[in-house]
C-alpha cells in the first residue's frame, strides 16, 4: 500500500475505535488512537497473515502487550477482514466475543490473550524463541505502552531476548508519554527508553509513530537487522485524530458521550476528506 492508502485506512480505523468505545460506554480510546498507525502498517503492509486462515502455521505473530487498547486491535482486525466491522459496536457488551481485553480463544486473528500489563513481551519472546528453535521463518511483533514498561517483567524478557539474539522479534513501544493518572515521566520515568533497550543488546530505532514514512523505514530496518532483536520507540500523540482527546491523559480510559462522539467523528470525517484531496 502507498502511504496515502495507509493514512486513509488508519483514519477509517480511528472512526471504528471511536464508534466502538462510544457504543460500549467504556474503554480506552487514547492509546488506541495513538497506536492506530502502527496497527495499520503491521496488518496491511508488514506482517505475513491471512484473514481467511487466521491460524496459518507460518503466519507472523502479534502480541498486544498493552491489552487495554483492544479497541485499536479489534478495529484493525475488522478493517482487515477477520470479522465483520458491524460487530465492533458490541464491544464490552454482555455476550459479545469482543470484550475489554483480547481473547485468543474467541477472536479471529488474536494470537495471545492479554490485559495484565507487563506480560506480553515475555510471551512474544517465547514465541520468537520457539520460532528459532523450530527453524521457522515467521516473525513476532509486540506492542507495549510507555507506562507499561514501568513493569519489571518487561525488562527480564528484554534481557533474555537480547541474550538469545532473537532477531525475529520486534518490540514497538507506543511512547505517547501519558498513562492513566498523568504523564509517564512524572509517574515513574522510564527514560531514556532507547538506552535501556540498547543495554539489553537490542537494535533501537527512534521514530515518529504517526508518520508512515518513518514507520515504513523502521520496519524495513528491523527486517535487515541480524543477530539482535529490534525495539522501535514510536513517539506518538495520545488521542491522535480527535481534537479534544489529543495529549489529554483523561482520555486514557473513558468513552465519549453522544455530543463528544459527534465532534470526534466530525474531526475524522474532515481528516478523511482532506486525505481524498491529496
Where is each model-derived feature located?
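Glycine/aspartate-rich loop-and-adjacent alpha/beta segment that forms the canonical ThDP
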Residues: 212-278
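Thiamine diphosphate
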Residues: 109, 113-116, 121-224
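Short acidic, glycine/serine/threonine-rich loops at helix termini
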Residues: 74-75, 103, 153-155, 181-185, ...
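N-terminal capping segment at the start of a domain
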Residues: 10-26, 174-176
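Cofactor-binding active-site loop characterized by glycine-rich and histidine/acidic residues
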Residues: 17-21, 32-163
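Glycine-rich beta-alpha junction loops
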Residues: 68-69, 73, 176-177, 211, ...
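N-terminal hydrophobic or amphipathic helices/low-complexity stretches enriched
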Residues: 1-13
Amino acid at each position: 500500500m502507498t502511504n496515502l492508502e495507509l493514512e486513509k485506512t488508519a483514519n477509517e480505523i480511528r472512526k471504528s475505535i471511536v464508534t466502538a468505545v462510544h457504543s460500549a460506554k467504556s474503554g480506552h480510546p487514547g492509546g488506541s488512537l495513538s497506536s492506530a498507525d502502527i496497527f495499520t502498517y503491521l496488518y496491511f503492509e508488514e506482517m505475513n497473515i491471512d484473514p481467511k486462515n487466521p491460524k496459518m502455521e507460518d503466519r507472523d505473530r502479534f502480541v498486544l502487550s498493552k491489552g487495554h487498547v483492544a479497541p485499536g486491535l479489534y478495529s484493525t482486525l475488522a478493517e482487515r477482514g477477520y470479522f465483520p466491522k458491524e460487530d465492533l459496536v458490541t464491544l464490552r457488551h454482555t455476550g459479545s466475543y469482543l470484550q475489554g481485553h483480547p481473547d485468543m480463544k474467541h477472536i479471529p486473528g488474536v494470537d495471545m490473550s492479554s490485559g495484565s500489563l507487563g506480560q506480553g513481551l515475555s510471551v512474544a519472546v517465547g514465541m520468537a524463541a520457539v520460532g528459532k528453535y523450530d527453524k521457522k521463518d515467521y516473525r513476532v511483533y509486540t506492542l507495549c505502552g510507555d507506562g507499561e514498561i514501568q513493569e519489571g517483567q518487561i525488562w527480564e524478557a528484554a534481557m533474555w531476548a537480547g541474550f538469545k539474539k532473537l532477531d525475529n522479534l520486534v518490540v514497538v513501544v507506543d511512547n505517547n508519554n501519558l498513562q492513566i493518572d498523568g504523564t509517564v515521566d512524572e509517574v515513574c520515568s522510564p527514560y531514556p527508553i532507547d538506552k535501556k533497550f540498547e543495554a539489553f543488546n537490542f537494535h533501537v530505532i527512534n521514530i515518529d509513530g504517526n508518520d508512515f514514512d518513518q514507520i515504513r523505514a523502521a520496519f524495513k530496518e528491523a527486517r535487515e537487522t541480524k543477530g539482535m532483536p529490534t525495539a522501535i520507540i514510536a513517539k506518538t500523540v495520545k488521542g491522535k485524530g480527535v481534537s479534544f482527546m489529543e495529549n489529554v491523559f483523561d482520555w486514557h480510559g473513558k468513552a465519549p458521550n453522544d455530543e463528544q462522539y459527534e465532534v470526534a467523528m466530525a474531526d475524522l470525517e474532515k481528516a478523511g476528506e482532506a486525505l481524498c484531496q491529496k
